Amino acid sequence: MLKNNINDSKNLDRTFSIAPMLDWTDRHYRYFARLMSANALLYTEMVTTGAILHGRGDYLTYNQEEHPLALQLGGSNPVELARCAKLAAERGYDEVNLNVGCPSDRVQNGRFGACLMAEPELVAECVDAMKQVVDIPVTVKTRIGIDEQDSYEFLTHFIDTVMAKGCGEFIIHARKAWLQGLSPKENREIPPLDYDRVYQLKRDYPALNISINGGITSLEQAQTHLQHLDGVMVGREAYQNPYMLAQVDQVLCGSTKAVMSREAVIEAMLPYIEAHLQVGGRLNHITRHMIGLFQGLPGARAWRRYLSENAHKNGAGIEVVKLAYQSVQTDLVAQ
């Protein structure tokens, strides 16, 4: 009845995905991203098992429009992870992903994230526990190594061990993580990228679905990686320059639909914003994710400034978004 074969994860199109990013990839950002790309696989922020099982809020809320959508879990207790995976499947998530890549001290203190690379048998046990109770893909996001344990053999031992319990999809951040001495931000920038190691992994494990993450800033770079791998996961660039998503379907996925204009994206966001405001939400909960929409264009500064100065004010409504767009048009005319 349950899907426990190694190819489960190939049921989803993994050509392009947006990385789970704490404080960034919340449900408002994901709705915004989905407007621009129908094909991108979206990920939640990492949610800990403790938050889901014992927290007061509902950490699994999302909009139906966000599909396909994966829940990223942080944890290392197989029983708790299985409970959370089952809840995710019952709520309609399309995938559960285990975080084995975050190097922050807080995450390490909870015994999850990148430090779990040193315990591949435990990761395998966690994957197995989740796969036993769900029929959606269970995947792992990890690094190419940790600290001085950064040999190719270390990575393949990890892959072999976790794969043996049925994990058929790995998202590899092509940097190792330093567990001490670097901040999470520094761990995304200082350890050198080694794309060739991830390419080699795909050559050695052709049956696995392998996506690459780390330092990817354009769809042209994504196309290059896709010559070697099954998928590309983009993080910061997809947030800071979100309009790159508007061409994902056409450039990477073969869509013949017209590329959505920035103006059309803004117009499509207005009903969503209004609905959020009507239930007591604040405008800046949503517009903070839209700040980079005009990245690289004349008017980008005017857009950012107007939203930053006005969206947080009490009573701010959609007129703020409209006026911000007018300021962009004024700058464009001035050019």
Swiss-Prot record:
Q: Which Gene3D superfamilies match?
A: 1.20.120.1460, Aldolase class I (3.20.20.70)
EC number(s): the record gives 1.3.1.-, 1.3.1.91
Mind telling me which CDD domains this protein's record contains?
DUS_like_FMN (cd02801)
Q: Where does FMN bind?
A: 20-22, 72, 141, 173, 213-215, 235-236
The answer to whether UniProt assigns keyword tRNA processing to this entry is: yes
The cofactors named for this UniProt entry are: FMN
UniProt keywords (A-Z) are: Flavoprotein, FMN, NADP, Oxidoreductase, RNA-binding, tRNA processing, tRNA-binding
InterPro entries under this entry?
Answer: Aldolase_TIM, DUS-like_FMN-bd, DUS_fam, DusA, tRNA_hU_synthase_CS
Q: Does the keyword Flavoprotein apply?
A: yes
What are the recorded GO MF terms, alphabetically?
flavin adenine dinucleotide binding; FMN binding; tRNA binding; tRNA-dihydrouridine20 synthase activity; tRNA-dihydrouridine20a synthase activity
Q: Which residues form the active site?
A: 102
**Its catalytic activity?**
5,6-dihydrouridine(20) in tRNA + NADP(+) = uridine(20) in tRNA + NADPH + H(+); 5,6-dihydrouridine(20) in tRNA + NAD(+) = uridine(20) in tRNA + NADH + H(+); 5,6-dihydrouridine(20a) in tRNA + NADP(+) = uridine(20a) in tRNA + NADPH + H(+); 5,6-dihydrouridine(20a) in tRNA + NAD(+) = uridine(20a) in tRNA + NADH + H(+)
Short name of one Pfam family for this protein?
Dus
Mind telling me which residues the site (Interacts with tRNA) is annotated on? 99, 185, 188, 301, 304
Family note: Belongs to the Dus family. DusA subfamily.
Q: Which PANTHER family match?
A: FMN-LINKED OXIDOREDUCTASES SUPERFAMILY PROTEIN
Q: What does this protein do?
A: Catalyzes the synthesis of 5,6-dihydrouridine (D), a modified base found in the D-loop of most tRNAs, via the reduction of the C5-C6 double bond in target uridines. Specifically modifies U20 and U20a in tRNAs.
Q: What protein name applies here?
A: tRNA-dihydrouridine(20/20a) synthase
What organism is listed for this UniProt entry?
Answer: Shewanella oneidensis (strain ATCC 700550 / JCM 31522 / CIP 106686 / LMG 19005 / NCIMB 14063 / MR-1)
